[in-house]
């Protein structure tokens, strides 16, 4: 199966404007995310952006960047727009949406997000154990999953605020995998 990683990036973040170019130990955040995606060795890596500064940074470091409409409503819309531009041969089986603010993501986890697609799910994501500090933090997305001793299972619901105690809550990791049909369907909801 042919996979591609697309990293959506925008400078006009509501919570932290200019975030993609903010340096972490001297290297812009978006460049660090792009490097982690390259390290995963899963397939081609693209940064989907609407600002020329981000585009030029990635290209000047040997990467591939796709310019997208600055008015797109979400990162997934940006990923979809870039996917349509690069899938000329209709040969991409898996699209990985890696958030542009995940500079510390383990490259192995990027590779792991395709496992649900290989098992006939149409959308995949990752979850990890939730610690006590994260449970009531609205900035941490929680996902309800009943793994039943399986490593891969269906997500039942996503939460920011938790109003009931649920033992099946996990910390949702903001990376997704899609089949071409599922991302097309998702965008058109």
Task: Annotate each language-model stretch with its function.
Residues 2-49:
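N-terminal glycine-rich phosphate-binding loop and ensuing alpha1 helix
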Residues 8, 97-99, 126-127:
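Short beta-strand segments
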Residues 22, 55, 184:
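Nucleotide phosphate-binding site architecture
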Residues 30, 101, 179:
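Residue-level signal for inorganic ion chemistry
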Residues 42, 90-92, 119-122:
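Short, high-confidence coil segments that cap the C-terminus of an alpha-helix
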Residues 46, 52-98, 102-112:
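Short phosphate-binding loop-to-helix
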